[in-house]
Amino acid sequence: MNHSAPGNADKHGESLAARFAEAPHIAASTTDERRFESWLAELEPAQSARLEALLVQPFGRNILVGIAEFSPYLFDLVRADPLRLIRLLECDPDTHLAALIAEARGAVLAAPDEAEVMRLLRRMKAEAALLTALCDIGGVWPVMRVTSALTDVAVSSVQAALQYLLRQEAARGKLFPPNPEAPEEGCGLIVLAMGKMGAGELNYSSDIDLIVFFDPDATTLAPDIEPQPFFVRVTQGMARILQQRTYDGYVFRVDLRLRPDPSSTQVAISRDAALHYYEREGRTWERAAMIKARACAGDARAGEALLAEIAPFVWRKHLDFAALADVHDMKRQMQTYRGQSEVAVEGHNVKVGRGGIREIEFFAQTQQLIAGGRHPELRVRPTLAALDVLASSNWITLAARDELARAYEFLRRVEHRLQMVADEQTHALPDDREAVERFARFFGYPDREAFARDLLRQLEIVQGHYEKLFEGDDPTGTAKLPALDYSAGPDDPRLFQHLTTLGFKKPAAVAQTVRDWITGDYRVFRNEATRSAFIEFVPALIDGLALAEEPDRAVVAFDQFLGALQRGGRLITLLGQNRDLVALVALVLGAAPRLGEMLARQPQLMDGLIDPRFFGAMPDRRELSGRLAATVQDAASYEEFLDRLRLFGQESLFLIGTRILSGTVSAQQASTAFADVAEGVVHTVHDLVADRFAAQHGRIKGQETAIIAMGRLGSREMTASSDLDLILLYDFDSENPDSDGPKSLQGAHYFARFTQRLISAFTTRTNYGVLYEIDMRLRPSGRAGPVASSLASFADYQANEAWTWEHMALTRARVVSASAEFGERIAGVIRDVLTRRRDPATIANDVADMRRAIAQEKGETDYWDLKYAAGGMIDIDFIAQYLQLVHAHHKPDILDVSTLQVLDNAARLGVLPQSEAEILRAAARLYHDLTQILRLCVSDRFKPETAGTDLQRVMARAGDAPDFSSLEARVKETQSEVRRVFRALLEGTSPASAR
């Protein structure tokens, strides 16, 4: 029997009885079978005949006999109303449930008094309870459809009760709803469904967890009505309607204790008090609870607004591994309280016991808490949906997702069957074997042993995954390391021997450094909790640093890093929970001090290294845009928006840089990634500044603005230190030059002010530094020209005034932010300029003159100045630009913003000999590879004699050389070859120069 089967829900149109796919296991000739048969015989003949006709279907009789034998509660429902049972067996269950809920809501609206409301809701609940039980026991609905049906009944019941009460209050003149038919709209009362109700996963006999808030400033109350007493009374009335036991039973037990500080607060809490509590006192378990929170009744708009305001409490901006320990402590306390520390069968609690439902929920919720702030896609309510997203985002494996999902569905069915026995919110199996035997047969198993095998297998699978997340990796890192006194220093022979065994060449110096960490006066350790956490982490840290290519240098680099670190509690926790990153961080600190300084200033940059996507494929522009949008979407102010943009930019630089150092991306991939990040940031800033500027100054009729990327951003060849070369172009209806805002500006002045505002968004120094340095000297007339140009003046300048070097720069021009139509117009202007007929000799002379001028200004004798050295990258760029300007008129396919692509195009079109193209392509790739490393690791000129061996090793690997001296020889030889080609093309008589 498959107890996590998908159900028989797809056979729409057939009766429920015809869709049964499984049933309890009935032993031959039981007393309870005779009990069922005698009840059947007592029915009126017409009812008995209809029922017998339905029970000829497979499984139907065994389901009802099983109910009679194992579930007093369900058999009471069966006997109470035979016609109801017949109606259910004849119905399509999905259609019937929807109609049942709708009819009850309609009847409540017309109910004359509260007693009738209570009777209507209880009868709806009883019929829904029997229907969902039949669908669950008979395998008609998968278990999560059952939970969703139960949730639909609960939500509708809460809404109906609340709506009735608000209509009564309106009739008394205490409430003035804009829409009397829907008094909840705009009333300011918010009912949040929590837990399984919030996630649409309600169990069979569940309480419903609700929190009630109200917004006293946004109600429809009469002027003389105090909000809190009013809403407390309404909340109490709602709970009474739902849970008070009457002749017809109850609807749902209501639990209001998940509200802030329930022992000292009223059952309805003001919005401001709630926000203040969550901001100041909210605990991790309350954050976890809020993952599933959903506005289910009352003022829906106010509910969604409140959840948005609570979101920063739930979803932290940075990875939150502290939640891991908090949630695990909570779980241990529950197990201790309930005595559920081992997997078992008899007496085992399938909810909070080892391997139970709660461990699956905590497994998902904890990882949602850790990463949901950075990854909004993880903010889903249902447990199975959370497992799906965790798997698709690579936080867990697909195998783990599948195993946990199967276990979850199995255990939820066990839980339901336990609760169906007596309509009790129980989660524990019976304490004796005989009772478990009976339960197993109710669940469809032939005996206890068959059930126990399946149960224990699922519990052990869950326990294994849970322990791997919370316990198995030993967060302190000390389980597998020798018990040593790391504060003993170099005089301890055991520590000395251990460090030697790990591969440290200077164990005494390392031992002294470690003692300094533990006992010294580092700023980061002035917080005693941080020092204690670090001391626990030291064994794992030393183990990780020993894996670096040069362990002794890694220790020195980490020591310097600790000295620069202002605050580091989170960083120590992150490294402690992710010990495999220690060696990578050591590489970063040793080879790229610039990145180390960034990490010391902003320890949260580590978050990206822990993201499972870090070592996957580089994100494309679309994915980056999504991440950027998620980063800034809920910024509370313009200043916070700027901070988040800067943090996004710095983290992106740090992550791409780390991947360059670790050799997991090529230089070309890194160039593209840097450009994609910059382009996304430019587009985001452009849109936001435009909207803010328009709010103040309005818009001009027909206005368009565009940002053109030049230089390295234009060619998508950026490095970690590239600034942004930008030009801003605009257009508008010249006959209507005034903007329509409260502070109107005219024409060119409007766009000049807008451009200055745009530059400020990039260059203003905030707590997170500068976003990008902006260079606009490539605009028409350079520094002498206006900061923004109209498209018409730009086109005229390029056609009639621009110098050759400006047209060379234009070969890299690319529109990165504009409307599609305006962007195409600009691209057309650029294309027209570049495809003009030009004299090859004149262009060659201009390019050669410019190269000589740059050499005079910058020098060209330092062969490690890969850009300006004779035969360096400038030579290759100038060759590519020369070839485009000379040949684009009759071979427009040569045009491209990328130097490498231009060289490919030129060779393919026959305007550059293949041999020379190959020399230039190989050189460009080498220079790109090395330049990415140097821009990342060196802030000034590169000097081999002072470069550390970590950096030399990384450079040799990037240059595909066996060692650094071989790399030097290759660089010199390459520059000689490139300079030869440059002279042949631009200073000599090569056929390519005039072809």
From Swiss-Prot:
Its cofactor is Mg(2+). InterPro entries: GlnE, GlnE_rpt_dom, NT_sf, PII_UdlTrfase/GS_AdlTrfase. Keywords: ATP-binding, Magnesium, Multifunctional enzyme, Nucleotide-binding, Nucleotidyltransferase, Transferase. Transmembrane segments: none annotated. One of its GO terms (molecular function) is magnesium ion binding. Residues 479-995 are annotated as: Adenylyl transferase. It catalyses: [glutamine synthetase]-O(4)-(5'-adenylyl)-L-tyrosine + phosphate = [glutamine synthetase]-L-tyrosine + ADP; [glutamine synthetase]-L-tyrosine + ATP = [glutamine synthetase]-O(4)-(5'-adenylyl)-L-tyrosine + diphosphate. CDD domains: NT_GlnE_GlnD_like. It is an enzyme of class 2 (transferase). GO terms for cellular component: cytosol. It comes from the Bacteria. Its EC number is 2.7.7.89, 2.7.7.42. Residues 637-853 are annotated as: GlnE 2. Residues 122-333 are annotated as: GlnE 1. The keyword Nucleotidyltransferase applies. One of its GO terms (biological process) is regulation of glutamine family amino acid metabolic process. Pfam families: GlnD_UR_UTase (PF08335), GlnE (PF03710). Residues 1-474 are annotated as: Adenylyl removase. Belongs to the GlnE family. Involved in the regulation of glutamine synthetase GlnA, a key enzyme in the process to assimilate ammonia. When cellular nitrogen levels are high, the C-terminal adenylyl transferase (AT) inactivates GlnA by covalent transfer of an adenylyl group from ATP to specific tyrosine residue of GlnA, thus reducing its activity. Conversely, when nitrogen levels are low, the N-terminal adenylyl removase (AR) activates GlnA by removing the adenylyl group by phosphorolysis, increasing its activity. This is Bifunctional glutamine synthetase adenylyltransferase/adenylyl-removing enzyme. The gene is glnE.
